[in-house]
Amino acid sequence: MYRTILVPVDISEEELTSKAVRCALDIARETGAKLHILHVLPISSAIINAYALGYMEIKDKATVKAEKELSMLVDSIDLPNDRISYSISFGSPRDEITSTADEIEADLIVIGSRRPNITTHLLGSNSAGIVRYAKTSVLVVR
């Protein structure tokens, strides 16, 4: 049924990441799908303005840290190496996730979400944005 499952994760949110990965892994095992784990490092205009001169250094350090943590996560997933991949990108989580889903031709996105609170109702959440803008099916795991 599914060939490629995209699992966007926030490696700093261990509980959400774990729930989404477990769910996606169950689906991948049942369907023979490949998993692609994606971590998006958001770029806030405040960070860019505050550190404009050292932006590349900050970006490089964040990438190295994320690469290490994401690699450890992928290594812990019990799936053959040819069925799991990962990537890191910079930008708006919603835009990067929907763009990556298109690029890898994902037929399912599995994303973790917290229970909504007043902030997410007023401002929206990454999960809500992905559900709204993705061209493929999205499974939100709570």
Language-model-detected regions and their locations in the chain:
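Small/aliphatic-rich secondary-structure junction motif
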Residues: R3-Y51
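General small-molecule cofactor/ligand-binding pocket signal
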Residues: H36-L38, S85-S89, L139
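Glycine-rich, Arg-bearing micro-motifs that act as flexible, cationic patches
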Residues: I111-Y133
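Structural beta-alpha unit
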Residues: D75-I109, P116
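Acidic, proline/glycine-rich short linear motifs
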Residues: V40-K68
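Short secondary-structure boundary segments
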Residues: V9, G112-R114, R142
